Amino acid sequence: MKSLPRLLKNAGLVILLIVMVVAGSLGYVVRSPMPQTAGSIKAPGLQNAVDVYRNPWGVPHIYASSSHDLFFAQGYTHAQDRFWQMEFWRRIGSGRLSEVFGNTTLSTDRFVRTQGWARVAAEEEKMLDDQTRFELQAYADGVNAYLATRHNLGLEFTLLGAQGVKIDPEPWTILNTLTWAKAMSWDLSGNMAGELNRVLLIQKVGAQAEQELHPPYPGDHPVIVPSPAIGLNVADALAQVQALDDLTGGGFEGIGSNNWVISGKLTATGKPLLANDPHLGIQMPSIWYEVGLHCRALSDVCPYDVTGFSFAGAPGVIIGHNNRIAWGVTNLGPDVQDLYIEHLNPDNLKQYEVNGAWVEAKVVTEIITVRGQVKPDPDHPETTKGIYKKDTNTTTLALNVRLTRHGPIIDEINKQARTLSGSVNGVDIPTPAALALRWTALEPGFTFRSVLKLDRAQNYDQFRDALRDWTVPSQNFVYADVDGNIAYQTPGNIPIRANGNGQLPVPGWSDDYEWTGYIPFDELPRAFNPPQGYIATANNAIVGPDYPYLISLDWDKGYRARRIVNMIEAAKGRKLTVDDIKAIQGDDSNLSAQEVMPFLAAVSFDDPALKSGLEYLKKWDFQQTLDSGPAALYNLFWVRLIGDTFYDELGNDDRLWPGPGGDTMLAVRNLLEQPDNHWWDNVSTADRVETRDYILRQAFSEGYADARSLLGASPDSWAWGRLHTATFRNATLGRSGIALVEALFNRGPVAASGGPAIVNATGYRISKPSDESSDARTFEVASVPSMRMIVDFSDFDNSLTIHTTGQSGHAFNPHYNDMIEPWRTIEYHAMLWSPAAVEANQKTHLTLEP
């Protein structure tokens, strides 16, 4: 989040904290929000008593007699541990951050309000079936029961209050849960930024060069289910996308996941093993909250017995297992967002063209309340002119949103009147024009009904029936059950296009590029008990070229998938165990480096130090472990190779820079086979034409110098974990710019193994060194395996899991950061299941009483 640091740059807050430390009151302030986890508590609204057992990791297992009480208690427990996180995310989802953070988040609120996440969620609420509504309301009632009894909800509330930002939390509602889901859908199903970046790249280097930077999925990587010039000005729209991504932790190539399921035919126990590790932006606290939801006796009144991972703010379990089935989820990466170029009426900007006729856009007015006075923005005069009230220190703004048949116009009002020139797909762009967004998540859906049906499902047919309601975000589901079956299913609304492939903005003034429907559920990719005995997904292509529908052209390039499959295949001839699955989840192999090294190894050096450095690197086992010196040297070389190859053409616009992951790895692999390709030439040098070997030599020389500068002269002191570190930052106050405040909330840096496009997917962003100084280079982890889960069907109590930080969102709670160390060293805790195991491992026992 780039804009929030300005919020707390206030000397008064620093002075307050110092006084609190000196006075000894800081301990009380940080302890007072800690929840009661033992004994008994009256919770009005419950029908019967509920037992909450927490294990040594703070994971609650909830036992209730009705689904009402079960979800009531889940809401209560989420609020105990994570209410600040819930408050922050509901403000993101509803576009209400500026009520707290003022000008710094206004552009993001405008963007979310323009899309209308809350408007769509309100439509979804009207469509809820009785059971789903009942259970969502029970959850909300549990949250509110906790709010009614607590005054100190979190240290964040206290420190913001010291800044004069008093937050009186509103009651939790079903709508808050539904808007929260829109924020997650944005993280997991957006390719709008890809369209906009593609436009910028084509404008900069041309269509052919753009294709070389983003090559198609390679034919030698696994498939899950075998079988022009543009004159658009998209910079403003892309800035809005990136600002929202900064808040949610998404929007770059590290977002993905691994999952796989192995038939009992290949395991030592004869029962299936299922594994999952979703990759999301690094954050504090963890996005996941582990929980067990158990009906004391399964019945129509209480049909749940499930454990796994939930989101604080939503009922149920998103990933996990119940008494009969287990499921894991990875991001499908479908193309479900399209940008349409709308032709506006120059005499009436509220009208747009449809097949030769002017049509009135529907205008919706969104009222945004902003803390403080809004700073005038000459680029956005209509959305920064408001009414300021001195007594409340707030400004009220009116945002008029125009809705086309495709969706909201996402440009600001003055931008809409500007001329977009040129052509798209060979069609001249009329003037004036604007961009409208069509996205499946902006249409009402039934995903929460799907989640709760999934938690209740008892077999493969019920599993598939639950996923029929899973509208967004489209995901890869792997499945196993107690009968020994394994399966795969793609769910979700994936559009069928009359024309086009979703890669670039398309004309919206005719029907030529309309969505004609969605791929029917029964025609979405699936597999059941495949002959190879396993199914693995890692955001790679799920279908081959013969599949009749377009799902995406933006697959992960398959390095992780290839390694997972190779490791499973390598074990054939012996039976796989849980230890094998742990080894796969923690694998640090860099397959791309194996492709690059033969070319680098063939380059000669005159300098004895560089010769020695290259010999050192040649002995590397390609594992990016914490203590690997060669891994450190290779990654320093790798980012230099990317910069030396591409930055001269792409310039200083970091939005265009290739990342260090799969797309760039495949692009470089292809270019290495073309020693005289134009990308190797440095266009800023007039006296020579560089070739592949020249750039390899230059990049290694620079990377070797970086290693000596950053890690010391002796390779004996080099280690990947010294460069590649993870810092878990609180999404708001952890980015305050005040060291004392950040120390309260943030944890790290800690050394991390793995890297981009590696199974242990700890991705980093490339930062271009200022003035080419190696000291500015960073490999800070930006995306992580946000949790790891292994389900053992021979005995559910043998299942294992971990997530990134801890169960608690309260700084200084013992469970705020107690999972960081085992997470980074690929260790696990037991994913307890049976009542006997839960009670035997209980650390605390709380009874919630009506």
Walk through the language-model features, giving the residues of each.
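Glycine- and hydrophobic-rich flexible loops that cap the catalytic core of alpha/beta enzyme folds
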Residues: 295-309, 314-316, 320-325, 329-512
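N-terminal Sec-pathway targeting helices
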Residues: 1-20
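Substrate-recognition/specificity elements adjacent to catalytic centers across diverse enzyme folds
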Residues: 10, 23-284, 298, 307-308, ...
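Hydrophobic alpha-helical segments
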Residues: 406-427, 433, 469-571, 623-626, ...
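Charged, long alpha-helical assembly modules
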Residues: 637-721
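Stable alpha-helical elements in mature extracytoplasmic
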Residues: 93, 117, 132-142, 284, ...
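Terminal end segments
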Residues: 550, 554-570, 574-610, 696-850
